[in-house]
Structure formats: structure tokens, C-alpha cells
């Protein structure tokens, strides 16, 4: 066995061990409180590990490759990019783990400032530490942006997210905001992607609409060749779909295929582009392909049942996912098999959104009259 093969094998053993820590924490979190006004599906917590009860206070770290590190906590995974420019953090776990997360960042990065935080979506197990982690950082202020406003802005890391994350955090409908003001994103975008250049490499923030939620972003570190997938991809359970937050199973499949489009495997389909899931162990393209294939087979089975007119109860009784339950199913906890089956069925039977708001009305068809068209 070559030295490189030994390194690959050791990396996979460590990644699997870290994944076991993450999965143990995930299954211990059953009914977190997401606050008010988030709907039935969210109140049952579809995304694994959400909430403030952290059964294990430890955070483990793993150097993935290049500038990128993976942090594994009981609630979720986070990602660091560390270099001469400072630190970029992808997701901040929970408020209860924020102090330990900051301490782990200091172990890895020393006194390098936390410059950016990227939220992959709105859920509290990925954004709960925003306020504390941002306060431990420092923004890059350029030009003539000075005075009190500039000084105050510079004393926090910039929090980047899709605008739908801010919309849901700030409760624009007039209801009480679900998060403190200082936890909200400070830099949002509404386009398909956003680009950064930090620590000597290009970073792509890729938005996948209507997938796990309506504000999902995957982060691709181009030089390091690592993707932080958030909850668009997990290894512990069936794909979580928060329909109350704009999610849809069809979008999850789109996200998985997009990840596969980006990843390039190394020798024997191992290594190459690494993918850090929102929950679970470190993975590569082959792992995502396996997960995508499972999700696609399930979609096809449900579509066939729906075409034959089966109701949700009939689909549940048919147990169309039973051959995958041993690996991804759960009878209790944050995301059960029944919740998954219901989300897939409702996603595939939901009416297509009206296009009248974005598509101009068609011009009336020309009529034939004397002398030609008029």
C-alpha cells in the first residue's frame, strides 16, 4: 500500500469516527423549540439535530484538505477556511455550542480574525451561534467607511446568507422575530450564486431554491476542492425537507445532482473533491452518488404510486422505502421515516406555482382579415 493510500485510509477511519459522534448527538435531539409561527413540520424539527439541547459538549475537528477544516458537534457540522486573510466559518452550530466552537477555531487558527460567516440555511442548529461567533470576529472595512458606524460594523464578522434566510429570521410579517437582531445576516444575496475571493482561493456560494428550505446555499472552496453542503446532503437519515420553510423534495434531488456535477473523484473513486454534509461523516463523490441514487429510486416509486392514484395513507402502508430504512430510517427523533414519506408525497403532489407573476401575458393571436393579418 502506498503512502498516499495509507493517508486516505486513515482519513476515512477518522472521518467515520467523527461521523459516529455527530450521529449520536443527532439522534439524541428529539423535540427542540424553534419558537413560534414556524408551522407543524418545522415544529417537529425535520432537520437533524436542531435545537439548544446539546448532549455532548465536545467539538471535534478534522483537517480536510487545503485551507479547509471540518468541525463536528452534537448539533451539526461546521466548516472553517483558514489562511493569511483570516477565517471564514460556514455555519455556527447552536447557541449552546458557540463558545466551544470559538475555542476550537482559536486552536486551529490562532489569533487570525474571523472575517466571514456563511449560513447554509435558516435552521437553528446551523445558525444558533451566529451572534456569539460574529461578535468574536472582525469585518474587513475598506475605503472611507469610518466613524462610529464603521467602527461598530468592523467589530463583528460579516454574516452572509441568501435573502430568504434573513426574511425568515427577521419575521417580516409583523410577528415577533425568531432570532435576535445581532444573529441576522448582514450581507445577503438573491441571485443564483455569489462569489468571494478569500485566503488565496475563489469561493462559490451556490443557491438551490426550494430544496431543504427556500434559502439553501452550498459553499464550494475551489482551490481546496471542498464543498460544504449544509443540509442539502446528510449521511445519517433520509433527506430532510422542511416544506413549511419553502422546501421541496424535487429541489433536494437538484441539489444532490449539482454537488455531483462539481465533484471530481481521485483514484478508484475515492478522495478528490470532499463534501462536508450538514450532519454525519466526511464524504466524497461516491458517497453523494449513493445517496442521490437512493433518493431518486424513492422518487420514482412515489411517482408511480401517485400516477396510480394512491393516497398518502396507501403509500405509507405500501412501505415504499423499507429497503432503505435500516440505513436511513428512524421511528423517533428529529426526522422520522413517516415524516420523510409525507414530505416526499406532498412534494410530488403539490401544484406547480403560478407563473402569472413573472411571465407576461401572451399577445392575442393574430386574426386573418381582408388584406392580410391585422
PLM features: what roles do these ranges have?
Residues 61, 84-88, 96-149, 155-157:
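Active-site metal-binding motif and surrounding structural segment of the metallo-beta-lactamase
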Residues 67, 81, 91, 105, ...:
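Divalent metal-coordination and catalytic microenvironments
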Residues 4, 28-49, 140-142, 265-272, ...:
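Accessory terminal helices/loops
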Residues 4-18:
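Bacterial N-terminal signal peptides that target proteins for export
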Residues 20, 26-85:
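Zn-dependent metallo-beta-lactamase
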Residues 63, 86-87, 94-96, 150-208, 213-214, 222-223, ...:
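Metallo-beta-lactamase
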Residues 60-112, 217-230:
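Conserved beta-strand hairpin/beta-sheet module of binuclear metal-dependent hydrolase folds
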